[in-house]
Amino acid sequence: MMMLSKSLLSAATAASALAAVLQPVPRASSFVTISGTQFNIDGKVGYFAGTNCYWCSFLTNHADVDSTFSHISSSGLKVVRVWGFNDVNTQPSPGQIWFQKLSATGSTINTGADGLQTLDYVVQSAEQHNLKLIIPFVNNWSDYGGINAYVNAFGGNATTWYTNTAAQTQYRKYVQAVVSRYANSTAIFAWELGNEPRCNGCSTDVIVQWATSVSQYVKSLDSNHLVTLGDEGLGLSTGDGAYPYTYGEGTDFAKNVQIKSLDFGTFHLYPDSWGTNYTWGNGWIQTHAAACLAAGKPCVFEEYGAQQNPCTNEAPWQTTSLTTRGMGGDMFWQWGDTFANGAQSNSDPYTVWYNSSNWQCLVKNHVDAINGGTTTPPPVSSTTTTSSRTSSTPPPPGGSCSPLYGQCGGSGYTGPTCCAQGTCIYSNYWYSQCLNT
């Protein structure tokens, strides 16, 4: 997800005796491999369903990790995406989790109890609960540090980060530290170069060259696991010309998925932030599946969410993904859970809470459909339901007006009711959005 509230999770209450006793029995596990445009997970080739749980990496109570993973696994989900980064520039207060402190005078990778040892337990628990993890190394956004923390330490900006020698040297040191800890763990589904990498206004060659070099480096460290980019799928010539299909954010999905040292493609979908309607997402899935099919690799629909009527609007995306050649799996944003002490996990408007009606629709029903069950997701509504921040139709290709709050791809746009071509007066940095002025 692009932007999350910044919060470092503090310690929770101790585990109950019952939770300590009820330990799952892990099945025989193996490294994930690829078979055509699908994945082989522990000897079974097919389509998988998964979720995102970025906050799982920062839980200090092991019982909370175990209960969350128990709920995810028992729901039939196979893969969980967790953050593998937590970058800071100054020493946090005691008890707060941080993985890396970045400084031009000497950076520190935290392997202590308030550092990578918390991620150690996440990997251990995933092994126990028969789950696989996708772990990104850096965030494009400033949540949990991200590229901005590197910029604070080594200078430059978010676009020069990809070619900044000092920043890239430290990034690779961190990659090596993380990969070396888990290179032999069958709980790792894939290493991810970053969460939603962008290079606004850059040639798409910048990210292609960076992704090629870094993915080759990761492969040199670990030949057991898959590697992927972690991009949103922005930049694709086969779409309708709406903002997400354009190349202003410096990414070219078709080029990226063709990189030999990347094993599969990823893409995300957020109509509420992109100025598109919900049904538009079905075509977005199909065009990316076609690009992956052309590359001979699987696509993973890695993040998606709808702020309004999630069951009605997201279930058709799941059906489209499941039934489209080239798709290997999907992972909704994001999992929500309640811990033994009654506290709830971090959440946002897209959260699907365990045991909720949306969980029944988007998790249990979807898993049943994958496993050949008879559960039928709700049909696409005959009338398009959109957020108040969403246009009823995608922005017209090459037009002079994009919907209010629709992303304008970094170009100069302004206007009281829509993004009209001109000079940008107020832009939302996080989502490249044209806002009301």
UniProtKB/Swiss-Prot annotation:
UniProt site (Important for transglycosylation activity): R198
Signal peptide: 1-19
GO cellular component term of the entry, any: extracellular region
Region (Linker): 377-399
Sites where the protein binds substrate: E196, P197, R198, E232, W274
Annotated GO MF terms: cellulose binding; disaccharide binding; mannan endo-1,4-beta-mannosidase activity
Catalyzed chemical reaction(s): Random hydrolysis of (1->4)-beta-D-mannosidic linkages in mannans, galactomannans and glucomannans
Glycosylation sites (chain numbering): N157, N184, N277, N355
Residue ranges listed under propeptide: 20-27
Region of interest: Disordered: 372-399
Record localization: Secreted
Temperature dependence: Optimum temperature is 75 degrees Celsius.
Catalytic, as annotated region: 28-376
Disulfide bonds: C53-C56, C199-C202, C292-C299, C311-C361
Active site positions: E196, E303
Xref: SUPFAM superfamilies: (Trans)glycosidases, Cellulose-binding domain
Compositional bias annotation for Low complexity: 381-392
Residues annotated as transmembrane: none
pH dependence text: Optimum pH is 5.0. Stable from pH 2.5 to 7.0.
EC numbers: 3.2.1.78
EC top class named in words: hydrolase
Role description: Endo-1,4-mannanase that catalyzes the random hydrolysis of (1->4)-beta-D-mannosidic linkages in mannans and heteromannans. It is a crucial enzyme for depolymerization of seed galactomannans and wood galactoglucomannans. Active against locust bean gum and ivory nut mannan, releasing mainly tri- and disaccharides. Also has transglycosylation activity. Transglycosylation of two mannotrioses into a mannohexaose is the major transglycosylation route.
Assembly notes: Monomer.
Record comment regarding domains: The enzyme consists of two functional domains, a catalytic core joined to a carbohydrate-binding domain (CBM) by a serine-, threonine-, and proline-rich, highly glycosylated linker sequence. The CBM binds to cellulose but not to mannan, and increases the mannan-hydrolysis of complex substrates.
Protein family membership: Belongs to the glycosyl hydrolase 5 (cellulase A) family.
Full protein name: Mannan endo-1,4-beta-mannosidase A
Source organism of the structure: Hypocrea jecorina (strain ATCC 56765 / BCRC 32924 / NRRL 11460 / Rut C-30)
